[in-house]
Amino acid sequence: SGRPPGPGETWRSPDLARTLEKIAATGAEDFYRGELAQRIDDFSRKYRGYIRGEDLEQYSPEWVEPVKVNYRGYDVWELPPNGHGIVALMALNILKGFDSCDGDAALFCHRQIEAVKLAFADCFEYLSDPRYMDVSVEALLSEEYAAQRRKLIGRRALLPAAGTPSRGGTVYLAAADGEGSMVSFIQSNFRGFGSGLVVPSTGISLHNRGCSFTLDGAHVNCIAPGKKPYHTIIPGFLTREGKPIGPFGVMGAFMQ
């Protein structure tokens, strides 16, 4: 229609509905190796994009081990890099070494803010596709490294360079049952509607996560074929003494 839907208005995408039916009927095979894959390839070439049918064909989902830290008796779990869930864990590692703030709300907030800023500084320097990282997750989450970073936090705010606020387009879902099973699920096209490009007759909106790469050839997160970019989505879990407390997550790019 050329306009966004209004409040309460039902939005329909028959093209996307047909695409989802095709994906369901083929077990996603068509998306990665069939007609849909070819349409994505053709569309990408037309607009000088970098997605090719070979990229889709070579993709397969990965089963990864989550990473965690213990924060005051609770195990906090996140996905490993290339996502930045490790930022939350690094900040918690820094914070848990502080004594009580004795009711000083300003000091309490100050320490949290500074810990997150320090964690992000490391994140932007070292995080990437784990196959390319030259600093290990274990090193970043070590107690010794957290102690080094903690020493940098005093009564005054650190002064990082000003950045550009980011806007996100993310959906998060959490579910749990009475038997301890938990699901922490997040999906994002990144900024706004992603790239703003929809593959004709499919309803598929292409994301723009590639903009999280850097063009600095010497940086660990430099763009490369088959490489995963630094990622902002961080679905998590909370457990205590091996027992589930609950899933958690939030929308909002770097504010997560």
Where are the model-predicted features located?
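Noncatalytic scaffold domains of N-terminal-nucleophile
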Residues: 1-27, 31-33, 37-83, 141, ...
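Active-site-proximal alpha-helical segments within enzyme catalytic domains
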Residues: 15-22, 93-94, 176-185
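Active-site rim segments in enzyme catalytic domains, especially the processed small/beta chain
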Residues: 50-52, 181-246, 253-254
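Short, small/polar residue-rich loop motifs at catalytic or cofactor-binding pockets
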Residues: 63, 167-170, 231-233
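Glycine-rich phosphate/pyrophosphate-binding beta-alpha loops
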Residues: 77-85, 170-174, 186-197, 250-256
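M16/insulysin-pitrilysin zinc metalloprotease superfamily fold
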Residues: 85-99, 238-246, 253-256
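Internal maturation/activation junctions in enzymes
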Residues: 99-189, 201-202, 209
